[in-house]
Amino acid sequence: MTNAPIPRLALLLAATTLSASPLASAQNAERQLAGVTRNQNTLEIATNDGRYLIKPYSSTIVETTFIPRGERLDPASHAVILAPVQVQATLEDEGGRLTYAIDGGISVTVDKQPFRISYAYKGKPLVAEKRGFGRAGGHETIEFALEDGEALYGAGARAVGMNRRGHRFQLYNKAHYGYAERSELLNYTMPVALSSKKYAIHFDNPQIGWLDFDSRKDGTLRYEVIGGRKTYQVVAGDSWDHLMAGYTGLTGRQPLPPRWAFGNFASRFGYKSEAETRAVVDKFAQEKIPLDAVILDLYWFGKTVQGTMGNLDWDRDTFPHAEKMMADFKARGVKTLVVTEPFVLTTSKRWDEAVQKKVLATDQAGKPYTYDFYFGNTGLIDIYKPEGRDWWWNIYSTLKRGGVTGWWGDLGEPEVHPSRLQHATGSADQVHNVYGHDWARLIAEGYQQEFPNERPFILMRAGYSGSQRFGMIPWSGDVARSWGGLQSQMEISLQMGMQGLAYMHSDLGGFAGAVLDDELYVRWLQYGVFQPIFRPHAQEAVASEPVFRSEATRVLAREAVWLRYAMLPYNYTIAFDNEQTGMPLMRPLMFVEPDPAQPAERSTTYLWGPDFLVTPIVQPGATRAEVYFPNAGSVWFDFHTGQAHKGGILETVKPVEANIPVYVRAGAFVPMAKVVQTTRDYTGREIDLHYYHDASVAASSGKLYDDDGETAGAYAQGKYEIVRFDSTFADKRLEIGFRTETGKAMQAKERAFALKVHNVQAKPRAVTVDGRAARFTFNAQQHLLEVQVPARKGQAAQVAISL
């Protein structure tokens, strides 16, 4: 395990020191410019009370840091990994102001009196400081001016509405047990604000505080923090795609998860024995419900909920042959995941070892800090000590070599984290928001050293800006098993995707409460088909697994799982796009709706990838649902019936029991597969390629990404194939082309495509494949044309259809 230091947090200054420092009383009116120095890319502005460093990372990203007089620069960032590039920029002194302009991008203007920094992008005003770095009410603060009508997003995982302007958010990762349709504070609090003007401000400091999105209704974005770095980055974009690319380029992109992560999980709180776990896996096979992983909650290391946390080893009474069990599951294509927590109870088997090896956080005297919480009297692993990191990683490594495939990190806010507790790099309050982030880093770096060819699966309940680069799979916490709980989930996932964490998902069916509601369960699973991870999970009083529900419910749930597996090629492809560009899997309508007057700022309908429009049913007994079809001039087809809908229109549709309303964009290519019992059996050799034809689409394109599903960095190593599709339509002739890009280290795969063209109104006059007449089938009732494209390596073909 690496001993590389985790970035050290600046220690919190004593209140007496702060009150005497220049920062304590500095306001814009008192801050005066004293000089300007340009050092390569960085612009240094001296003031009477400190200095500013303005540093471009690219033409669209600029970082601003204030260093009060008497303090030193703290260059360490937990969030930022992008290396600044050399940019072409000009500096002009216009007497009353300085303008530092980056060619083709952001310009920074510094007004001299009163001192004020503002930002523009390509000549258009973006955002400006309203009140510079200062101190008020026991916090270090900075304020920005907002325009009327400007919407704000971000601040982590919340459930308050898509436009979060008007709220003041605490920055303190915290579990909210049993929340439903509303929660202002959850497990991921992130110091980032995104604007409808397509810019983001990231406050590069994980210490606890507040992010105020104009709660006082005075046009102010206000950041308040107990101490630490006074640094923020402004990211600008021409479009939402561009902004997502910029922000994730700054903070890191999510590596592609293993393919099995897009399958179905069996999970509950929890399986209490090896025999029970084996029976559950057997039941999925018997019911022909696909399964790729089983997750073991805390009973894997102890027989009781309380008193055993921190054992971090198999309870051999209840799991006597754990390694054999996991090997048997693996042979069936089912992976095993186990829960781990950062707490070591004083009653656990490892307590004495943890104390002796000095792996725990301490009190002021340097002794292990112990305290009571729900699970018992405990200490907390200090991952900021080399001893703590190495000790914990060695446990992971041992479990991994025994057969564990993935990790569930629970309670990682940390759930109870007393302010008096000390870590190696600072107080609990200084590291609290970044603890889960650095926990994921510990596992990711351990894999890079010991298992460099494998993709880790790291399911975490808490994190920070940039956690996605460690492969973190976030979930939305202990949501109530209620309709209100379901209603909040789309917003949480959409917002987190905009903040880089594109795999935010919920416990399907809801977690908290002994509620048996089959309709709620089915609707949640139907939504789950179109969320990043398909993982039913709940308290054990009511079964979370479809195999243990009523027959009618089981049938509907099976259909949802089958559709999830059929969509594996499409889902894996949009996950690859997320790795490459940072675009989230779930996307708000505003990403594609150009008209701000339209109702695109809603979470009740969203985009899945670039092609699907999804409206989950979130009310019991719903007989109607509103769907806004974005982008006037576009056409959307009902995924289940083929009915066409025009874009730019808000419609009321009638839901059916078998599925939720889902639509596909005209011009979309959707690769799908035959359903398999486990993704291990997916080969990618036979693909159903659905193309949604419409006369309004003159040209379109799509792709299929494929690799072995398990090798870390497969694309970068050239171990991949991309099959690209394109279409043109003119003079009643539709042409669809296939061409394959094979990576330098990939052996070309022989693939056959069943091309299925939707919305064909009459039987074609002729169909050719590579210039030769081809057989086809035409379903006049469904308006569906099917053409077989023969299997070949490095697939390259041209299909021409005369309509």
Describe these PLM feature segments.
Residues 1-11:
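Bacterial N-terminal signal peptides that target proteins for export
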Residues 25-251, 255-260, 269, 274-276, ...:
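N-terminal accessory segment at the very beginning of proteins
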